[in-house]
Amino acid sequence: MLKIKLEKSAFENAKAECSLVFIVNKDFNHAWVKNKKLLETFRYEGEDSFLDQENKILYVGVKEDNVHLLRESACSAIRTLKKLAFKSVKVGVYTCHTHSKDNALLENLKALFLGLKLGMYEYDTFKSNKKESVLKEAIIALELHKPCEETCANSLEKSAKEALKYADVMTESLNITKNLVNTPPMIGTPIYMAEVAQKVAKEGNLEIHVYDEKFLEEKKMNAFLAVNKASLGVNPPRLIHLIYKPKKAKKKIALVGKGLTYDCGGLSLKPADYMVTMKADKGGGSAVIGLLNALSNLGVEAEVHGIIGATENMIGPAAYKPDDILISKEGKSIEVRNTDAEGRLVLADCLSYAQDLNPDVIVDFATLTGACVVGLGEFTSAIMGHNEELKNLFETSGLESGELLAKLPFNRHLKKLIESKIADVCNVSASRYGGAITAGLFLNEFIRDEFKDKWLHIDIAGPAYVEKEWDVNSFGASGAGVRACTAFVEELLKKA
């Protein structure tokens, strides 16, 4: 992990083996920009990057005056520098446009520091010829790129320290999530997922309970158990319950995650091409583990419960079948018409368990539907629920954190599509259209009336795992949901 060191000095006086200078919105008129004739000779116009080898300066373009692009450019810069022979880099403080003018400096520092740190991530656990970067340190010269109000300048050091704590915690939490999602299925079993959660709990002084199939049977979590039936003798299920209890808690929040450690579709078998990347079907549960790490280390004033349903969905003589009727923990019967709509079955019972805790807010995270990816693209998560104020708060705070989110609306016509003639509800829609919403409406069937306005469903199927670099995310897992929900909880508590 890249170490960030704060220095109360001018950019020119800070000592490092190389310099990083951002060109914001193609503006070269700044003292930190050297040898402009060289840049003109090579026709560098402030897009992408350019290495001035003589002066040991890496120029990286920030295409617009936007804090999210600053974060992305900082990440891109480190991806370039970590391939070179520099051990340290220095960079000044930039103030790009933010949504919130009150916290503009802090948000810029958070973006800069997080971008720098995330640029170092690469999942290379199984590579035999790892090339470890020599880049170890980023020196932050506490000098502003351009003048700002006196109050802004006076709060620079304080804001930098706060931003650095955020970046350290968020990087660690995202890496926990990403490493778990990226872990291949021969290792990343339900038991392994529980072990990762136990390690996080031990290091963060969190309370944790890990329950096996006997507990699930006692609690009549039959929908969850059905999904695991084909794997029971080899990789049994685990219900993981992490708890963070601060001395002062303004709210009780339950975070619920789908933890499908591998999903072949069950007897409704996926085509081979669609089976690849299904190690990432534990993205929701992994995000919840990362979130408990983030929220506890940031010291939020909320009691937070993280509930993860960890299981495989495989084939075998004991596998649950299309035509089965399952009785959920809530007592509702479910007609199974497709065993590849399994995540919602696990979540149904886990959401029931979460409601027993009587929380003020429930948020579930799941790589739930391919339909969500079709509708919103692979970079955007969907927000669903009944409470418009809660949905809006998650969307605005999540967007400000740098994640992409969009609301999808429930409606009575789509709800009719999951009706069953022989059970209380069907696990798949009668139509191919609106699949992300009908999946959310299925979960809604297991939310009690008193919790309808306290519940949000976040479908992270798109951004949880993408097989290319994008924004601050490397190939593979992105940690979708962690930044967004952390920001959501912080904003929620401000209103408490």
From Swiss-Prot:
Gene Ontology cellular-component terms listed: cytoplasm
* Gene3D superfamilies, per database record: Leucine Aminopeptidase, subunit E, domain 1, Zn peptidases
Name what cofactor the protein needs: Mn(2+)
Enzyme Commission number? 3.4.11.1, 3.4.11.10
- Which reactions is this enzyme annotated as catalysing? Release of an N-terminal amino acid, Xaa-|-Yaa-, in which Xaa is preferably Leu, but may be other amino acids including Pro although not Arg or Lys, and Yaa may be Pro. Amino acid amides and methyl esters are also readily hydrolyzed, but rates on arylamides are exceedingly low; Release of an N-terminal amino acid, preferentially leucine, but not glutamic or aspartic acids
**Residues annotated for Mn(2+) 2 binding in this entry:** 258, 263, 281, 342
Question: Which InterPro entries does UniProt cross-reference here?
Answer: Leucine_aapep/pepB, Macro_dom-like, Peptidase_M17_C, Peptidase_M17_leu_NH2_pept, Peptidase_M17_N
Which GO-annotated molecular functions does the record name?
A: manganese ion binding; metalloaminopeptidase activity
Q: What does this protein do?
A: Presumably involved in the processing and regular turnover of intracellular proteins. Catalyzes the removal of unsubstituted N-terminal amino acids from various peptides.
Q: Which NCBIfam families match?
A: PRK00913.3-1, PRK00913.3-3
The protein in question is named: Probable cytosol aminopeptidase
- Whichever gene encodes this chain, its name is pepA
